[in-house]
Amino acid sequence: FCRIRLQDTNYQEYHNYRILDSSSFSRCLEIYKQYVTYKKFKDIVPIFIEEFELPHSDVIGYYDGNDLVAFTLAYRFKSVNSVWADQFGWDYKNKKLSLGHIANKSECALYKRLGYNYYYLGESSDYKAKLDGYEISNFFDTWQN
C-alpha cells in the first residue's frame, strides 16, 4: 500500500466538488459501473450502498458544470489520524477534466486542511508515485506515526 504524507504536500482543493449526501449515492453507483466498464476491469471490487452511509465515510463528488461525474469513497480513521481512499469512479464523458489526478490532489489538500497526517491510496502505481509526499507504507511499523 502507498500513502501520502500530507504535511509534504501543497495542493489546492478542486473548485467544483462537494461532500455528498444520500441523495447522490445511487448516482455514484451508476458512475462506478460506467467507470469499470470504461476501464474494462475484469476483477471488480464491489461497492455496497451501506459503505456510503458509514459514519466515518466521506463521499466526495466532482462536478462538470452542474453534473456529478466522479466520486471518491474515503474513510476517516481518527485512531491513526489518516484517511483511506477506498473507491473512485468517473464516467469519463469529458476526459479533458483528468479527474483522477485532480481528485488525488484535491483530497490531499482537503484532508491536510482538516488536520489529517496521511492519505492512503491503496496499491502503489507509477501515477501515484508522482504525488508529493508519496511513500510506501509499512503499516505495522508506522501505523501510529
Model-derived features: where do they sit?
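Terminal substrate-recognition subdomain of acyl/acetyltransferases
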Residues: 1-21, 118-145
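A conserved beta-strand-loop-helix scaffold within acyl/acetyltransferase catalytic domains
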Residues: 15-96
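Acyl-donor binding region in acyl/amide transferases
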Residues: 57, 70-72, 76-138
